């Protein structure tokens, strides 16, 4: 826990540029040997932090019936958006994930994909909608909101929407809900 807290704090304060095994060891008070033993590398430690804080890897949404399915989907996307908006470390970690490709990142992506496909299967089974349709809409919503949350750290306005303020995100979420309502109304 101390290592994960330390890595999160270091990412907030310094970004990834100054994160190395020596700096993490010094700041956390945990020996390099223990870091290597439990995480194999600095990337392994960062991946453990992502696994602990990632929305999709820690979601437990179950869609049990068609009546509750749509409200649950809306809640799921709302929680995803709010998590991204309120967790600057997670946004930085997603940027890091996009900038490299290794076995640790591949494993994280595979785990996230399994969770996503499970959710898609549940929605398809309950709604009778084609898998391609649900998967594409989910990809569009998830990718676009993730991108906008990451962009909001550097660019306050996108397509005239103020993405570094609550009102802009209320507008975005409202249209996510409208998309979902249109899809499931047919």
Feature roles, as predicted:
Residues 84-106, 152-158:
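Amphipathic alpha-helical segments used for helix-helix packing
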Residues 2, 6, 10-44, 48:
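Helix-turn-helix
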Residues 61-90, 126-141:
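Hydrophobic alpha-helical connector segments
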Residues 49-76, 116-122:
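Amphipathic alpha-helical linker/stalk segments
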Residues 123-177:
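Hydrophobic/aromatic-rich alpha-helical bundle segments in the mid-to-C-terminal region
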Residues 57-62, 101-128, 135-136, 169-177:
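Amphipathic alpha-helical packing segments from all-alpha helical-bundle domains
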Residues 45-53, 105-108:
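Alpha-helical DNA-contacting segments of helix-turn-helix folds
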Residues 52, 56, 83, 87, ...:
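Phosphate/oxyanion-binding loops and surfaces in catalytic or ligand/nucleic-acid-binding neighborhoods
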């Amino acid at each position: 826990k101390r290592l994960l807290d330390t890595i999160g704090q270091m990412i907030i304060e310094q970004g990834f540029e100054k994160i190395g095994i020596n700096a993490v060891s010094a700041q956390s008070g945990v020996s390099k040997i223990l870091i290597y033993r439990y995480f194999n590398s600095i990337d392994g430690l960062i991946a453990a932090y992502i696994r602990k804080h990632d929305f999709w890897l820690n979601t437990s949404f179950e869609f049990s019936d068609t009546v509750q399915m749509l409200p649950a989907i809306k809640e799921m996307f709302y929680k995803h958006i709010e998590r991204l908006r309120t967790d600057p470390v997670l946004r930085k970690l997603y940027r890091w994930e996009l900038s490299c490709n290794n076995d640790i990142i591949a494993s994280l992506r595979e785990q996230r994909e399994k969770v996503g496909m499970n959710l898609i299967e549940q929605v398809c089974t309950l709604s009778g909608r084609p898998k391609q349709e649900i998967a594409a809409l989910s990809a569009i919503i998830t990718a676009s909101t993730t991108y906008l949350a990451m962009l909001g750290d550097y660019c306050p306005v996108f397509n005239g929407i103020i993405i570094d303020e609550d009102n802009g995100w209320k507008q975005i979420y409202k249209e996510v809900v409208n998309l979902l309502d249109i899809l499931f109304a047919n």
